[in-house]
């Protein structure tokens, strides 16, 4: 296991299975040429015939580090990453996606209606969705799953992958906050420390809706796994 992911470490290379070959190949192509000041990247490694993905497997350089509850530093890393990805065009691999993450994000942004189990978050989702209002923010390529993707080994954090979404950078930061509140033991003041970001209350709301929609659809979710998101939702609601 590496950063919570199934992977095999051999020398300075990590080999791991990927859930989507097309997305993994696109992400590898971006990370291969990306340089982000103040952020170490797990650069991808090609196969002997030049491919990024072979039969559902990909490889990257090993970057040392461990997960730490340094959530402000994770958001700072996110902001640096998204400054570097701001000029990327919308990837075609996102077109027509209907996986759990894509459905949940579309629902959170009011682009799709989902039938969600009330017992695993559907009721809370409906309550929060009533607070959603229009926003003026710009979508770009962002990392949609940064919580658990940033490692620390000294002062310079490391990014282990790139899970692309076409959403505002403020939303990606808000997802980190919601995850940290729900599952990372973050203190109640974390959302307030990033209140200078554009449309912040609504970005937090959409991040909470995203996680609630995902939780309510997840096959392993239950009422017992919901309290963390209930805590996060309560703190987000207080800012609306």
Label each residue range with its predicted role.
Residues 68-119, 164-165:
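A cross-family kinase active-site recognition segment
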Residues 111-139:
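Short, conserved active-site entrance elements at the starts or edges of catalytic domains
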Residues 61:
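Conserved Hanks-type protein kinase catalytic core
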Residues 191-217:
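A structured, mid-to-C-terminal "fold-capping" secondary-structure block
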Residues 214-240:
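ATP/Mg2+ or Mg2+-diphosphate-binding catalytic cores
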Residues 16-56, 64-84:
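A conserved alpha-helical element in kinase catalytic cores
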